[in-house]
């Protein structure tokens, strides 16, 4: 998800969803609608899935706008071009354990601004300028236990729903057909 602010009241929000490294949804703040893309078009997710994704991403957009405002205030930054990028999700490991992640990038820095470790729960400062935000969020921001629940429970439930649909997609495909033609070539003839 990315939010950019180029002047007061004018911002852009874009979220892309990936499943198994393939894009399956796109949401932008202008249309305020989650739409299937790529793999999502092939998956039979149903209208209620896209309505739920739209509702969830509208809330994520609101949260990112609030986070960007807080970060800009803590950094003493006003008008101008600013961006906040959030990468969050969960991965189902081979042993069926879940790895959740949430990384924030601010103003196109080459490194993360803040990261969340779902094992130990704290926000980790990736740059010294993020320390003020970390302290603010530890007292007033997203509670670590709720973030962990989102990454390990809510996200995993969504992952299982998509996985079930994806498996159905694979099961409903016809097996590939191959035609082989063989002819004898006599030596010296083509």
Report the location of each language-model feature.
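Extracellular/lumenal regions of secretory-pathway proteins
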Residues: 1-190
């Amino acid at each position: 998800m990315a939010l950019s602010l180029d002047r007061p009241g004018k911002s852009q929000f874009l979220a892309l969803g990936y499943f198994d490294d393939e894009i399956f949804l796109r949401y932008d703040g202008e249309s305020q609608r989650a739409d299937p893309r790529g793999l999502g078009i092939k998956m039979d997710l149903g209208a209620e899935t896209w309505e739920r994704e739209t509702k969830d991403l509208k809330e994520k957009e609101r949260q990112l706008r609030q986070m960007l405002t807080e970060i800009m205030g803590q950094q003493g930054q006003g008008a101008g071009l600013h961006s906040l990028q959030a990468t969050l999700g969960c991965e189902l490991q081979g042993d069926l354990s879940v790895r959740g992640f949430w990384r924030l990038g601010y103003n196109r820095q080459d490194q993360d601004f803040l990261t969340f470790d779902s094992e130990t729960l704290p926000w980790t400062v990736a740059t010294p300028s993020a320390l003020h935000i970390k302290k603010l969020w530890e007292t007033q921001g997203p509670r670590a236990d709720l973030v962990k629940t989102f990454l390990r429970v809510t996200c995993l439930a969504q992952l299982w729903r998509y996985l079930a649909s994806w498996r159905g997609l694979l099961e409903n495909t016809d097996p590939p057909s191959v035609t082989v033609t063989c002819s004898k070539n006599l030596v010296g003839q083509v």
